[in-house]
């Protein structure tokens, strides 16, 4: 299968848009101002194991995302498959499988009540999304939210993120298409440093929204063990053991969401939101004490460990 994004070598310095101080750009994905030239694949696109085919334009349609494996997800409500008015189709960012990408959230298997409550927080402004969820939530009806929540709650989670400890990663950029981080064509490698870099395991399949092709999260060496200590024990009083509320396996308890196997960028964004007050929902009262003493390195380590589970 040809790659949908066929890049030509680029010898241009990429300039990131300004980031809010204290928020790491590896977690808060902002498209680079300069983008590499791309040539979209012409004709029908296929992915392994699926009888379906789509054009590049259909794959990128935010009002009708591809359903590569309809038997795995069942019939989706209209709000998930097509959106409504200014409301994008939920499946365009979260995928019809619910697994999402680095810039969105993995909703598969979360409780419907939790999703409904989260959408209410976006609607009211109690939870501020750095991108688009507040604007999406406001015009949605209670019935649309309920249907979307029940759909994503019915999906099977797991097996989406592979974590690898390393010192070196490919040079990357954040695409304007979907705000995905992708390898910079011809860019070589660079030190990872104090970052987590998430990339599709297969670029062509990832940019085609293939729900069977997940992500690899490159994390600093030693970060998973450090995160394990913080998550399991609270790090000698620095924080509170996550399993108390999220379950020993981090798969969630009741309406408390799972954090196991989530995109580390997403987990980090939520911890920063609790720290900075951009999430001042009811649940933030519990999380404030959890995040109060966490450093940037702690948040990175927790995100790395949670993703590895």
Language model segments and positions:
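Short, non-ligating residues that shape and space the ligands of small metal-coordination modules
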Residues: 99-100, 251-252
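Flexible coil segments in periplasmic/lumen-exposed cytochrome c-class electron-transfer proteins
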Residues: 19-88, 92, 128-241, 276-309
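Extended intrinsically disordered, low-complexity coil regions enriched in Ser, Thr, Gly, Ala
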Residues: 108-134, 260-272, 276-284
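Hydrophobic h-region of N-terminal signal peptides that target proteins for export
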Residues: 9-18
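Cys/His-rich metal-chelating microdomains
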Residues: 96, 248
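Sec-dependent signal peptide recognition
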Residues: 2-8
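Cys/His/Pro-rich metal-binding microdomains
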Residues: 91, 108, 243, 257-260
